[in-house]
Amino acid sequence: MGKYIRKSKIDGAGAGAGGGGGGGGGGESSIALMDVVSPSSSSSLGVLTRAKSLALQQQQQRCLLQKPSSPSSLPPTSASPNPPSKQKMKKKQQQMNDCGSYLQLRSRRLQKKPPIVVIRSTKRRKQQRRNETCGRNPNPRSNLDSIRGDGSRSDSVSESVVFGKDKDLISEINKDPTFGQNFFDLEEEHTQSFNRTTRESTPCSLIRRPEIMTTPGSSTKLNICVSESNQREDSLSRSHRRRPTTPEMDEFFSGAEEEQQKQFIEKYNFDPVNEQPLPGRFEWTKVDD
């Protein structure tokens, strides 16, 4: 447990220990004392525990703050934990600053610019293109009317005329890139006229029924009506086909009926056609109503 130390006076100053244990000094030098359980001492003093050592350290820190003394005079047990150095503090601050700057840069990267400017620019470009097309081609449908007129007049040369005007339109579009908006309407009407010219030039041998030929330039509604009428005629012709007569039906099912009757007679010794019992395994009796 340690060595026994008796209370003594050093340089006229008294040094003593009391209670749970402590150290005091007077004059120039002082010595720290530690309570040890002696056989003569009472059992109330107890043993130095962790709680007591922590209380001693706190008390010594308070004394050092009130009356600072030289580090050589302090006992080794009462030495307070070394405070963190300035370099460590600086490193921690730099790490915190680095983390903050990294987060700021990351948040800046994630930010997106609003697309309002892009939308406005596209609208302005569309308006400029429309104005340019109106200025360069004030009536684009006049060309279409001429194309349709040429296609309806000619029968054999219509396809060549249409293809020639297609080439002219393509060359105009390549020269003027802003002609794309009106080109969709031109293409739709132009395909209609092209289909009409091809209808006029189709030979009759390709058609299944030459009686139902339609005039060139007719709408698709007439073709739909004709197809529906053809379907009705086919259904009526199928319904009016020759149906089998009753003797033919009897001849068709007679073989299967005879086989079933034979099997029934052999099994139950009863004639189902004449409704008469036959000699055999079962005995049949008539039930009175």
UniProtKB/Swiss-Prot annotation:
Q: Name one GO cellular component term.
A: cytoplasm
Q: Which Cys pairs are S-S linked?
A: none
Query: What ranges does the record list as Polar residues composition bias?
Result: 134-144
InterPro entries per UniProt: CDI_dom, CDI_dom_sf, KRP
Where is it located? Nucleus, Nucleoplasm
Q: Does the keyword Transport apply?
A: no
Q: Where is the composition biased (Gly residues)?
A: 13-28
One GO-annotated biological process of the protein: negative regulation of cell cycle
Q: Provide this UniProt record's keywords sorted from A to Z.
A: Cell cycle, Nucleus, Protein kinase inhibitor
GO function terms (MF aspect): cyclin-dependent protein serine/threonine kinase inhibitor activity
Q: Where is coiled-coil annotated? A: none
Positions with biased composition (Low complexity) = 56-80
Q: Which family does it belong to?
A: Belongs to the CDI family. ICK/KRP subfamily.
Cite the PANTHER family for this sequence.
Answer: CYCLIN-DEPENDENT KINASE INHIBITOR 4-RELATED
Query: How does this chain assemble?
Result: Specifically interacts with CDKA-1, but not with CDKB1-1. Interacts with CYCD4-1. Binds to FBL17.
Biological role: Binds and inhibits CYCD2-1/CDKA-1 complex kinase activity. May target specifically CDKA-1.
In Swiss-Prot or TrEMBL terms, this protein is called Cyclin-dependent kinase inhibitor 4
- Which organism is this protein's natural source? Arabidopsis thaliana
The gene designation is: KRP4
